Curated annotation (Swiss-Prot):
GO annotation, biological process: root development
Chain's role: Transcription factor that may regulate root development.
Pfam families the record matches: bHLH-MYC_N, bHLH_LHW
Organism of this sequence: Arabidopsis thaliana
Record bears the keyword GTP-binding: no
Gene: EMB1444
Subcellular location: Nucleus
Protein name per UniProt: Transcription factor EMB1444
């Protein structure tokens, strides 16, 4: 918002009881916060106007120091009074008595301790749409006034609404002589604000208004603007352009009280304390009843009055006739005469037109041509090339309904769009704001640039006419009714030939048709496309949103398993059934047990032929107890118990016919020695090819057929000695 924002804050404090005005800007971050964007503070010491609030010159000024401290505060959206006003849109009047009684925590939480100590007695916080919040402070107690709240919102609406007229009409006026000053009708003035009528007359009787030019570099040393009081705002100004008087509607709409060449924007506050921004243009002053009423039938697309409406009837009488038409609520007919262009003066800058360019992410935004100022001595010089810049339509009902989180692009407070004579968007009965989209062709944008550049040495009005005719064709015809979602929509494309075929008018004025607004309906919000120069038609297909998939329950997967993974799961399930105790093992343990079983089966297959060649028992029971001698050539080793008399041999180790294979036989009194013998054999790195037990009388006969691992050759005595160690302790105990 820059310099214009400073002007608005200064105008609010000028000639009023407010001592400072602060604008808290809504920054669309995560989380969204409000930071101090601009501030104006009335200096109590005449002649002292510090250039910055942080210059250290407020040590002797408690109010200036308190305002300077506000720049360090950050308000979260929805927290504190400022944050709550921003999210709710409801303004709040706060008095010092309320804070001092029982709400001391509010001072600390909102950072108002220094302000209360500096003498601030009234604080007003007003939400201005999705832009942010305005905070006012006064050293005296200011009574609640809904008209002031409405006026503040009007001022910021003028900055953020591209469909309205330019904001400079509110903040600047060029009145050169006292005779040209408009007079305020006493009836309107009394109804608007009887308490400030004297101050308003005094201000209007001053010799001109002190206006600070936008080119002024040192703004801080200028005196505050002497605007009309903040409870009034001129919505139309009578301007003299080449000897012609024109009544120009301002940014707040065209349905206002018009009497004696002056209009006062007033609001019937008995209906509601806060007037919706979308209804600001519908307040009409009724001279017969002395009250105000709303009208929704007026066509807001008319912009200017003809010369005959003003001059032929004596000026004021013509305005009275127009006021009667406003009271009747009827729309103005199409003008048959030339339409006046609302240039400030012949020395003022020429404001360029704008074209609508929709945005895909946030509704409609607009491509506007940059304003170019004309020098006093070069009225017919070439206009510079037009440059397009984006600005957000943050004042629309759609963005107000969706909240500040949706309008993220509305935080750019640079110089906003200013319309010269663009037709206002009119909402039909069967169409809502959420169904509007604007479609235009980029070919017409090039034509607008060519038209303005080719007439550089000609008349300035002819250049404006070419730009206006281009803009009139950029907006296509308004559709009568909405089509169902998903169906193709008929798109009307305006061609460049229609611009070229129209002959340039001498006055450079083309009357615009209010129906040159294209609305393409969509049930999901704003959506449109801009064609390139080679395109012939608009795309008609709309992307149908995908249906939400059902979420999978915990433990379930919405995706089907890959085939290879499913096969692995099946094989593991089979292994758990084959391997003993496999159902309780982990996958690693299951695989380890499987490997052991595979190795065992491999060894069995290798030694299967050896099991059939096992020799019969060589143990012979002799009654005499004599030692039997083996008849085999390989030899055998015997172990007997030596005692008082000879007994049957206990252990025998014998070589079999096949090399490396041995037969181990023994008689044991207990069968429990079988596992101990098997462990000893395995410890000797021998492979047990066969192991059997047989009951013989009171003793148990045990037989093993063994083989050395990896063809290892073992001596019989080594095996015999190891087995004797098993029985030796038991013989000793006996």
């Amino acid at each position: 918002m820059g310099y214009t924002l400073q002007q608005i804050l200064r105008s609010i404090c000028s000639n009023t009881d407010w001592n400072y005005a602060v604008f808290w800007k809504l920054n669309h971050h995560s989380p969204m916060v409000l930071t101090l964007e601009d501030v104006y503070c009335v200096n109590h010491e005449r002649g002292l106007m510090p250039e910055s609030l942080h210059g250290g010159r407020h040590a002797h000024d408690p109010l200036g120091l308190a305002v300077a401290k506000m720049s360090y505060h950050v308000h979260s959206l929805g927290e504190g009074i400022v944050g709550q006003v921003a999210i709710s849109g409801q303004h709040q009047w706060i008095f010092s008595e309320y804070l001092n009684d029982s709400h001391s925590t509010l001072q600390v939480h909102n950072g108002w301790e220094s302000q209360i100590s500096a003498g601030i007695k009234t604080i007003l916080i007003v939400a201005v749409g999705s832009c942010g919040v305005v905070q006012l402070g006064s050293l005296c107690k200011v009574e609640e006034d809904p008209a002031l709240v409405t006026h503040i919102r009007h001022l910021f609406l003028a900055l953020t609404d591209p469909l309205a007229d330019h904001a400079s009409n509110l903040m600047q006026c060029d009145i050169n002589s006292p005779s040209d000053r408009p007079k305020i009708p006493s009836k309107c003035l009394h109804e608007a604000s009887p308490d400030f009528s004297g101050e308003f007359d005094k201000a209007m009787d001053m010799e001109g208004l002190n206006i600070v030019s936008q080119n002024t570099s040192n703004r801080s040393n200028d005196l505050p603007y002497n605007f009309t009081p903040t409870y009034f705002h001129m919505e139309r100004t009578a301007q003299v352009i080449g000897g012609l008087e024109a009544v120009q509607p301002s940014m707040f709409g065209s349905n206002d009280c018009v009497t004696s060449g002056f209009s006062v924007g007033v609001v019937d506050t008995k209906h509601k304390n806060q007037v919706d921004i979308s209804d600001m243009s519908k307040v009409i002053y009724d001279e017969e009843t002395g009250g105000y009423r709303y009208s929704r039938e007026l066509d807001p697309n008319f912009q200017h009055y003809s010369r005959n409406h003003v001059r032929n009837s004596g000026g004021t009488s013509a305005l009275a006739m127009e006021s009667d038409r406003l009271k009747a609520g009827s729309s103005y007919p199409q003008l048959d005469s030339t339409v006046l262009t609302a240039l400030k003066t012949d020395k003022d800058y020429s404001r360029r037109n704008e074209v609508f360019q929709p945005s895909e992410s946030q509704g409609s935004i607009f491509v506007k041509d940059t304003e170019h100022r004309q020098e006093e001595k070069s009225e017919s010089s070439q206009l510079d090339a037009l440059t397009a810049s984006l600005c957000s339509f943050s004042g629309s009902e759609l963005l107000e309904a969706l909240g500040p989180a949706f309008s993220k692009t509305s935080t750019d407070y640079g110089e906003l769009a200013k319309f010269e004579s663009a037709a206002a968007i009119r909402r039909t009965n069967d169409m809502s704001h959420s169904h509007l989209t604007f479609e235009s062709s980029s070919e017409n944008l090039l034509d607008a640039v060519v038209a303005s550049m080719s007439n550089g040495d000609g008349n300035v009005r002819r250049e404006i006419s070419s730009s206006r005719s281009t803009q009139s064709l950029l907006t296509t015809a308004e559709m009568a009714q909405a089509e169902p979602f998903g169906h193709n929509k008929q798109n009307i494309v305006s061609t460049v030939d229609s611009v070229i075929s129209q002959p340039p008018l001498a006055d450079g004025l083309i009357q615009q048709n209010p129906s040159n607004i294209c609305g393409a309906f969509s049930s999901i919000g704003f959506s449109s496309t801009c064609l390139s120069s080679s395109s012939d038609q608009f795309p008609t297909s709309l992307e149908i949103p995908k249906k939400n998939k059902k979420r999978a329950k915990p433990g379930e997967s919405s995706r089907p398993r890959p085939r290879d993974r499913q096969l692995i799961q099946d094989r593991i399930k089979e292994l758990r059934e084959l391997v003993p105790n496999g159902s309780k093992c982990s996958i690693d343990s299951l695989l380890e047990c499987t490997i052991k079983h595979m190795l065992f089966l491999q060894s069995v297959s290798q030694h299967a032929d050896k099991l059939t060649k096992s020799a019969s028992s060589k143990m012979q029971h002799k009654d005499t107890g004599t030692l039997g001698i083996s008849s085999t050539e390989q030899g055998s080793s015997w172990a007997v118990e030596i005692g008082g008399h000879l007994q049957v041999c206990s252990i025998m180790v014998e070589n079999l016919d096949k090399e490396g294979v041995m037969l181990i036989e023994m008689l044991c009194e207990e069968c429990s020695h079988f596992l101990e013998i098997a462990n000893v054999i395995r410890s000797l790195e021998l492979i047990i090819l066969r192991g059997t037990t047989e009951k013989q009388g009171e003793k148990t006969w045990i037989c093993f057929v063994v083989e050395g691992q990896n063809n290892k050759v073992m001596h019989r005595m080594d095996i015999l000695w190891s087995l004797v160690q098993i029985f030796q302790p038991k013989a000793t105990n006996r």
